[in-house]
Amino acid sequence: MRVRVSPTAPYKCNLTSFDLYIRDYTVLRMRILFIGPTRVGDTILATSIINHYINKYKSSEFTVVTSSVSQNLFKKMPQLQNLIIINKMRFSLHWLKIWSKVFIYRWDLVIDLRSSVLSYLVITKERKIFKGNNYDHKVVQFTKFLDTKEKIIPEIWFDKNDVDDAKKILPVEGPYIAIAPYSNWKSKDWALLNYEKLLQRNIFQNYTIILTGLSKDIADKEIMENLLSQKNLKVLNLFDVPLSQMGPIFSICDLFIGSDSGLMHLAASSGCKTIGLFGPTDDKVYGPWQNVVIKSKTSPHDN
């Protein structure tokens, strides 16, 4: 087919349909490389950046580099073209392997939250390298990083079908309160005995209690068994349920209570009212975004 083209246009005058497709695809599709954090909580907070660019560039395509513990968070991410998992190797050779997958492309934008050398070894029109601080909340830091006046919010991705599937996992009717008593650091955790005492209060009698986390983190197995077998409470054991399922489950809970952990941020980003229990970590930087923090001067485990 013949097309009239401006003399200044960089395209030849005799274009085929394939040429037009390639031209339009190149113009409309913005290719973005996102190098994300390692930990689940940081990754969830960083979804505020991804969502900002998804909304800004409706036809963009993302390649996301993330850790194995965070990969399930991206199952329903819009505009995701490729997900690259960091499987650590000796001498940091995993970065060479990742580079071999991304250097072949010309990127429109590279966003690097790790300040890694990888972002300097690819061709891109724009490169944004994040440098954090120890006093602003992470979302505030990300807002400054993006240099935007728009409100950015950490939100994970799931749909109505995911919520319907989540309801099928729950054999007992709600309303629900979710509790995640463990993190990856014992000093951040409130003693399990305190949760047992808390759940004896009358306010919890009308709720189904969801206990969740990783079973390998359970330190007080006897107390946990007592909690799970409470006769005056409806308690569900949802330990080791994947993150991709816990997000929709949290979205139908009335409240989340738990340690400073990835699950705390997952609950908050799913729209669940969240109470985060903090001790040695800084709630001003890592608190659940736009939710409630209870802070102790010492480790919650000691209280």
Segments (PLM) and residue ranges:
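Catalytic machinery of carbohydrate-active enzymes
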Residues: 3, 17-303
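Extreme N-terminal basic, low-complexity initiation segments
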Residues: 2-10
